[in-house]
Amino acid sequence: LIRSRLVDTSNCFNLNSLLISTENNKLPNDRSISVLSNMLLFLNYEDRQIDSLIDQIIDWVDYDDQPRSNGYEDYFYTGPINEPRQYTSKRTLYDFSELNNLPASREFDLNDLKKYICVIPYSEKTNINVNTLEFEDALVLASYLGISIDDAEYLIMNNPKDGFKTI
C-alpha cells in the first residue's frame, strides 16, 4: 500500500525562502524574514521566540559556522547537552519535521504552524498565488502584504471573477 498526500504550496510560506543562495553561501532574505515574523506575530508569539526560531533555521541551513544572535551552529548541536549529537544540515530543508532539531521550535505549536508554513525542497520560492487563497488563508496574505487580517479577508472574499493580476 502506497499513500501520498498533495499539498498546495502556492498558499503557504516556504521556509526555504528565508535564505537566498549565492555561490559560496546562503544569505538571509530580509523580505522573507519580515513575512515570517509578521505571520508569527499574528499567531501571538513573542519577538524573542520569533527571532530565536528564525535565527536557528538560518544557522541550520547556511554554509558558515558563525551563529546569528539567537542561533546555533555545529558547536551546539555536537556538544554535551544535545542528544542525539548532530551537525547542522548546511542545505535547504527537505521536510517540515526538521524543525524538531531546533531548540526554539519547542516554544511553537508546529502542528498549528503547518497550516501556514511549508517546506518546498530545492526551492527558495517566496511568492503565493492570491487567486487560490481561501478565507482561512487570510493570515498568510496579511503576512505577505503587511496588512490586517480583516483587510486580507476582504481581498480574498472580493477576488475578481478573473482573479487578481497584481496586488
Task: List where the protein language model places each region.
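Compositionally biased linear targeting/interaction segments
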Residues: 1-167
